[in-house]
Amino acid sequence: MIFKQEDFKVFDEQTLDGRMQGIRSVIDPKFEQLAKVILPLLSEDGQAWYAHIAKHLRRTTNPPENTWVAFAPNKRGYKMMPHYEVGMWDDHVYIYLAVEENMKPVSTQKIVAQMTKARELVARLPATFTLSQDHMVNKTEPLTLTHYDLAVQKFAETKHSEVLIGLQIMKSDYETLSFEDTNHIMATFKALRAIYEIIK
């Protein structure tokens, strides 16, 4: 078990300092714990992988509505390449394979072609998987091939758009004492790995 239901209480704190203190003391250690499990799995592809825990350094007034750890084969950063993210909102934990707007415009044409090439594998993902078009907005839709194709098209044509696919674990799932999130997280990474190999 990585996360617990009580961890979500961090988002009840409405001040910037209070929430940041909670993120640093409660959630970030969970991300560090998760990295010890995930990095060996990712490194099976022969690359050196690194964990990047969100710092929220640009926040001056409003507290962050979500926080995350990103995994990428680059020590300096992750936003300019396809990467994995495990994050937390006030109502769920998410595990995504992410292609974000920072890749534009330099890599737009290349990554769009790669995402299009991966669509058949996307179609085989579990029906429980979701699609997000903005990692900073708590809004998703079912990961259908139609939704995926539209998201890729929007990514190609719109400056502020992203493609994130994966699994959400709802806060309510943690109410069950026997629930084990580690298994779901690991299984999601494994399910997304073949797609990553195409779009990386």
Swiss-Prot record:
InterPro entries: UPF0637, UPF0637_domain_sf
SUPFAM superfamilies per the UniProt record, alphabetical: YktB/PF0168-like (SSF142913)
Family statement drawn from the similarity comment of this UniProt entry: Belongs to the UPF0637 family.
Protein name (record): UPF0637 protein LCK_01372
Origin species: Leuconostoc citreum (strain KM20)
Organism classification: Bacteria, Bacillati, Bacillota, Bacilli, Lactobacillales
